[in-house]
């Protein structure tokens, strides 16, 4: 083959939930013969360097690397070290959303550096996060196709699009009144509270308008999903929303072996082998895994309800508590745990404070259910592992993903969340207990388990040679080759 090697730049937004799937994508394209370069800032480069080096050791003939872009926080009016969402999540002040907005708008500082690098390297394509709408203009200026990466499902993108076009929330009595999203396959019922509608007159609303406009003028969209999972919505999206969309996921399946699965994000707060040994001692399908994503810190009152609910369910569990370091202590002094909780549940439950090797855990045969916030990375990792889920959406587009799990795929049990977590309504211990019992051993548990297992097999088939996602990678690379 005399074709020039394809070179793709990957530019993730600086947050773990955005960096991890684009790292997976960079590895996927490297495995398919492309040269992959990840663009990021100094602090985030340190997070990506270790998994990239490990990947290169295992695959010395493949090309993958990092280009560091300067991001002078203090000069931009940000606190020292404010280079990713982790910093903002740990920022213990009431104006943390204002800091997030300032951080978001400050990323445009990298525009000139991006353009210089594109000009110098002349890559085949730029895959840039949706949070960088200005990247479309940068790529266009130099004649390089810009692909958008949203990091969510086609289903959620279709829901958002139709909410914006039809504005059904304007036609109901209140923000908690349910309505059907018009024009979509199936009856998707939601409320304005759950849809997390952005006021278009606010700075954030105006930013989203820029995001949509940049997508319209971009070359296309790369979706971390697989066609069979949401075919009606993938077709709808290609017909009405995006000119071109390639479904190339689940991206988490581009990780092979224990070390690669364990090394995707930050260093885990538990020894992987110790965790696997604990799981090996449990009956298949008997453990429920709870994790609410890297960006969700729940109040102590809610953690207490979860603890009582778990204990009441009688199930084995692994519970990942992702709170800020100054909020989570160790041992029995923690005021978010019932007195004597860990002692009473020794052998039955495992609490991981901080970061967990999630894909490694979900893939273990002992796991029988996953309690999730319905962030798309976690949702798709649960689907790829063939697991039924307890859905507990908290913000962003998570209520849409919940509808996909509970109403379309029918592999989810709703814990009872009806509005965004920031509104402060607690889920009770009784609700937690009921949902956990139901997902593991309820009346419809077996039916749900079989459907989830089938979807897991379909996910794995999609990324194998001849599968739908494998073929979409081919089609995308052929399209890039055709542009030369």
Swiss-Prot record:
Its EC number is 2.4.1.-, 2.4.1.91. Induction: Induced by pathogen infection and salicylic acid. InterPro entries: UDP_glucos_trans, UDP_glycos_trans_CS. It holds the Pfam family UDPGT. Keywords: Detoxification, Glycosyltransferase, Transferase. One of its GO terms (biological process) is response to other organism. Specifically expressed in roots. Gene3D superfamilies: Glycogen Phosphorylase B. It catalyses: a flavonol + UDP-alpha-D-glucose = a flavonol 3-O-beta-D-glucoside + UDP + H(+). GO terms for molecular function: flavonol 3-O-glucosyltransferase activity; quercetin 3-O-glucosyltransferase activity; quercetin 7-O-glucosyltransferase activity; UDP-glucosyltransferase activity. The active site is at 18 (proton acceptor), 129 (charge relay). It is an enzyme of class 2 (transferase). UDP-alpha-D-glucose binds at residues 356, 358, 373, 376-378, 381, 397-398. Plants overexpressing UGT73B4 show enhanced root growth in seedlings grown in presence of 2,4,6-trinitrotoluene. Possesses quercetin 3-O-glucosyltransferase and low 7-O-glucosyltransferase activities in vitro. Also active in vitro on benzoates and benzoate derivatives. Can detoxify the explosive 2,4,6-trinitrotoluene in plant by forming O- or C-glucose conjugates. Belongs to the UDP-glycosyltransferase family. This is UDP-glycosyltransferase 73B4.
């Amino acid at each position: 083959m005399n074709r020039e090697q394809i070179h793709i730049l990957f530019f993730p937004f600086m947050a773990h939930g955005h960096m991890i799937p684009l790292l997976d994508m960079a590895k996927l394209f490297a495995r398919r013969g492309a040269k992959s370069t990840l663009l990021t800032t100094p602090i985030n480069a340190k997070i990506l360097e270790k998994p990239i080096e490990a990947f290169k050791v295992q695959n010395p003939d493949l090309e993958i690397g990092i280009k560091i872009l300067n991001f002078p926080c203090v000069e931009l009016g940000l606190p020292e070290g404010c280079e990713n969402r982790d910093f903002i999540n740990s920022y213990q002040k009431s104006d943390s959303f204002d800091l997030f907005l300032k951080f978001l708008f400050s990323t445009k500082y990298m525009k000139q550096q991006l353009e210089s690098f594109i000009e110098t390297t002349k890559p085949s394509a730029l895959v840039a996060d949706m949070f960088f709408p200005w990247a479309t203009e940068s790529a266009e200026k130099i004649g390089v196709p810009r692909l958008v990466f949203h990091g969510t499902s086609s289903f959620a993108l279709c829901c958002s699009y139709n909410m914006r076009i039809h504005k059904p929330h304007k036609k109901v009595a209140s923000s908690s009144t349910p309505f059907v999203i018009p024009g979509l396959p199936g009856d998707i019922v939601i409320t304005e509270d759950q849809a997390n509608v952005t006021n278009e007159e606010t700075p954030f609303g105006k930013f989203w308008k820029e995001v949509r406009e940049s997508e319209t003028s971009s070359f296309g969209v790369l979706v971390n999903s697989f066609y069979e999972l949401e075919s009606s919505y993938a077709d709808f999206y290609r017909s009405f929303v995006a000119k071109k969309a390639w479904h190339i996921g689940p991206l988490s399946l581009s990780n092979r072996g224990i070390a690669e699965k364990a090394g995707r994000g930050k260093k885990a707060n538990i020894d992987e082998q110790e965790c696997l040994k604990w799981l090996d001692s449990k009956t298949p399908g008997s453990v429920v895994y709870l994790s609410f994503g890297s960006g969700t810190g729940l109040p102590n009152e809610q953690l207490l309800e979860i603890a009582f609910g778990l204990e009441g369910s009688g199930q084995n569990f692994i519970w990942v508590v992702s709170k800020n370091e100054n909020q989570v202590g160790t041992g029995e002094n923690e005021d978010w745990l019932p007195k004597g909780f860990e002692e009473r549940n020794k052998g039955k439950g495992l609490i991981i404070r901080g970061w967990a090797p999630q894909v490694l855990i979900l893939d273990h045969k002992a796991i029988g259910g996953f309690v999730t916030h319905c962030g798309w990375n976690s949702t798709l990792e649960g689907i790829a592992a063939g697991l039924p889920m307890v859905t507990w959406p908290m913000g962003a587009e998570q209520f849409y993903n919940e509808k996909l799990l509970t109403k379309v795929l029918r592999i989810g049990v709703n814990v009872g969340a009806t509005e965004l977590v920031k509104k402060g309504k607690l889920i009770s211990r009784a609700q937690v207990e009921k949902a956990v019992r139901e997902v593991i051993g309820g009346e419809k548990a077996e039916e749900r388990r079989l459907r989830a297992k089938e979807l897991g097999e379909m996910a794995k088939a999609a990324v194998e040679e001849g599968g739908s996602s494998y073929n979409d990678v081919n089609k995308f690379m052929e399209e890039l080759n055709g542009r030369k």
